């Protein structure tokens, strides 16, 4: 029988940061096991706690025993959009729709508050994450290489409010255009290691003027 799940903001649920941190580490072990590295995966409990303090967190709880099964952490920018920091589901519960339930609750919550879209990044070397985002209405709109990550990353955007460029059939075309521009900028301005090359350094200096 399928478990009954309750979705709440952590402001309501009051799950301790230690439990959130433990779930985060368990959920993202798959990444390190697959050789995917990122600075966020090395955060201490104290650093993780500071992220939680300045973010909105939704949690998925077992309706019978209130066990923590999943969480989604995001922060709001300029009132127009939110940036997803991370989405974590207990390993034994992955593939059962908990992440999608969390997302659905959050979209309703954000629409009521006038948000227009969600953004996030994920490693290009994590196909399970890439496919989940595409399946749940996100579009790939960016490409980047960084000195601090072991693999290139994709930037995703999920429209949550009506918009001409982000309604079908224009949304896929808009996303492809943004992705192509981002891919070109990254490959023109950065080396394979993610460092800025001379073109990138010149562009950065000109933007500061």
Segments (PLM) and residue ranges:
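Conserved acetyl-CoA-binding loop-helix of GNAT-fold acetyltransferases
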Residues: 89, 95-108, 135
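Acetyl-CoA-dependent GNAT
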Residues: 22-85, 90, 103
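C-terminal "cap" of GNAT-fold acetyltransferases
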Residues: 146-209
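Conserved GNAT acetyl-CoA-binding A-motif
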Residues: 110-122
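A short beta-loop-alpha structural element at the N-terminal edge
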Residues: 2-22
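Conserved beta-strand-loop-alpha-helix junction that forms the acyl-donor binding cleft
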Residues: 120-130, 147-150
């Amino acid at each position: 029988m399928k478990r009954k799940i309750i979705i709440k903001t952590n402001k309501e649920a009051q799950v301790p940061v230690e439990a959130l941190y433990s779930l985060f580490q368990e959920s993202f072990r798959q990444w390190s096991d697959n050789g995917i590295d990122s600075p966020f995966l090395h955060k201490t409990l104290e650093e993780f706690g500071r992220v939680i303090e300045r973010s909105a967190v939704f949690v998925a709880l077992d309706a019978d025993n209130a066990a923590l099964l999943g969480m989604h952490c995001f922060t709001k920018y300029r009132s127009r959009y939110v940036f997803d920091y991370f989405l974590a589901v207990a390993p034994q519960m992955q593939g059962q729709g908990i992440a999608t339930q969390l997302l659905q609750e959050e979209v309703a919550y954000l629409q009521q508050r006038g948000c227009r879209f969600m953004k996030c990044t994920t490693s290009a070397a994590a196909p399970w994450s890439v496919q989940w985002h595409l399946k749940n209405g996100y579009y790939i709109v960016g490409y980047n290489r960084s000195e601090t990550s072991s693999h290139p990353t994709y930037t995703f955007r999920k429209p949550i409010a009506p918009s001409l460029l982000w309604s079908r059939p224009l949304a896929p075309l808009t996303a492809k255009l943004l992705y192509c521009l981002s891919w070109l900028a990254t490959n023109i301005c950065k080396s394979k290691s993610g460092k800025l090359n001379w073109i990138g350094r010149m562009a950065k200096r000109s933007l500061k003027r």
